[in-house]
């Protein structure tokens, strides 16, 4: 390798560093100033890049934040599947408790809420929000409930898509409306109530 080649910057590595800095900045800033006051200029300043760098990769602050949340949800060490210990009720409680903790963490809650609110007024963003952030989780719950059916712990005729909505709907409603704390006790109560409805018929 020549001296010239050795000193040539690795453009792809540098671009990825800039990308990660931008995504981190968007997550941090939305928690500090809120989504309405979040700007591309502020993200660029925090990330140490020019705003044109951001506009080359993303058309809007919502697009930046969507990528940031997607990366956080699918990054290293993230397992999108639900545990299967053989006890579907215990497994659902474990996961919903962890979800309650995550949704109570300001570092996660602020950007995710910002996207949820923005998506309510933007059909294209809503579709991407559903496909990239919600559907993988919903599918994981569906797979775990299907395994519960196969194990005889859940009614074999249960509509699994509807069952997941019944389980998660009250949780999401409480979070979105800030109508109560997302405690482990609340998560357990939801699972217990749902499992009574999901149980095999005598």
Where is each model-derived feature located?
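C-terminal peripheral helix-coil segments that are non-catalytic and often amphipathic
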Residues: 1-9, 90, 94, 135, ...
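Basic, helix-initiating cap at the start of DNA-binding domains
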Residues: 1-46, 57, 63
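Base-recognition residues in the alpha-helical recognition helix of bacterial helix-turn-helix
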Residues: 52-59, 67
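Tryptophan-centric aromatic hotspots in well-structured domains and transmembrane helices
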Residues: 57-58, 129, 168, 172-173
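Alpha-helical DNA-contacting segments of helix-turn-helix folds
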Residues: 63-72
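Amphipathic alpha-helical segments used for helix-helix packing
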Residues: 69, 103-128
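Hydrophobic alpha-helical connector segments
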Residues: 78-109
